[in-house]
Design a protein with these regions (language model features):
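Short, small-residue-biased leader/transition segments that mark boundaries at the very start
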Residues: 1-7
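Surface-exposed, charge/polar-rich loops and edge strands
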Residues: 8-274
Length: 274
């Protein structure tokens, strides 16, 4: 039985009701990922902008300089700010479950990714492949963030095997006017976004992923681990767990393998300890 589960393993995804900014606010809300800058850099980038997502993903910026970013009051502030953003209409949930296309342009190259709900059991059983070890302290930090917000505020990036059917769907939508299209001042990258709301296209995308043997984490090992572990927690805490609840999925942007660029990730050893 165990062999059959491994042999016929496939990728499970689902559409979801995204929570996102109105078109006229997207440039004010958008931020860089939480782990590419420190607290003071985030504080500087968010200065004078109460709509910046940094108030949710780096909420220590709303406290005096030097506040421990892992203090419980900081996580509580993230949840408070997330509620505030929704109450004020700075983040609005879509009415129906969709897939999305997110394109990122940097150094003259554009990569197109499908934004999906990835399946927690796929992470736990190895259908989502990892290539990094994770640290428990960093996992717990992101787990607390997921718990207090009851949401994945930032996506993880996956890679998937090249697929002509998905390529055609992406081309069809990206030939249309995007919902968002802007260059972020923080990184100079282009960010473009489309909504896939056609039920037939949604069904085809789901089917094509189901035929894939695996997905591969390109970026976001700690966020993936945190989302999956919180999903497992919630399943254990729910006596009526069915397997189709929202906590069984987490937000991922999936890019085809032919659009990936492998970049050096170098380190300098300054001290050989004697």
């Amino acid at each position: 039985l165990e062999f059959r589960r491994v042999l016929f393993r496939s990728a499970t995804i689902k559409p979801f009701k995204g929570i996102r900014p109105p078109q006229d606010l997207v440039e004010q809300v958008a931020s860089r990922p939480y782990d590419v800058l420190n607290s003071e850099e985030a504080r500087a980038e968010a200065a004078g902008n109460d709509k910046s997502l940094y108030h949710i993903i780096k909420p220590e910026i709303d406290f005096p300089v030097g506040t421990d970013e892992h203090d419980e009051k900081v996580y509580a502030k993230a949840a408070e700010n997330f509620r505030l953003f929704r109450d004020k209409g700075w983040l609005v949930q879509d009415d129906k479950e969709n897939y999305y296309i997110y394109a990122q342009t940097m150094n003259g190259k554009t990569q197109y990714g499908l934004v999906v709900g990835a399946y927690v059991p796929d992470y736990m059983n190895g259908a989502i492949k990892k290539h990094e070890l994770t640290r428990r302290d960093k996992e717990e930090d992101r787990m607390k963030h997921v718990r207090v917000n009851n949401a994945n505020i930032e996506p993880v990036f996956f890679a998937y095997p090249d697929n002509a059917v998905l390529d055609a769907i992406i081309r069809k939508y990206t030939a249309q006017k995007p919902v968002y299209d802007f260059i972020a001042p923080g990184d100079g990258f282009g960010h473009t976004f489309w909504v896939i709301d056609n039920s037939e296209d949604i069904a085809v995308i789901t089917k094509e992923f189901a035929a894939m043997p695996a997905l591969y984490i390109a970026d976001g090992h700690h966020r993936s681990a945190a989302a999956a572990l919180v999903g497992v927690e919630k399943a254990k805490q729910n006596p009526n767990h069915r397997g189709d609840e929202e906590y069984n999925y987490f937000m991922a942007v999936c890019f085809p393998a032919n659009q990936l660029t492998i970049i050096d990730y170098n380190r300098v050893v300054k001290d050989l300890n004697g």
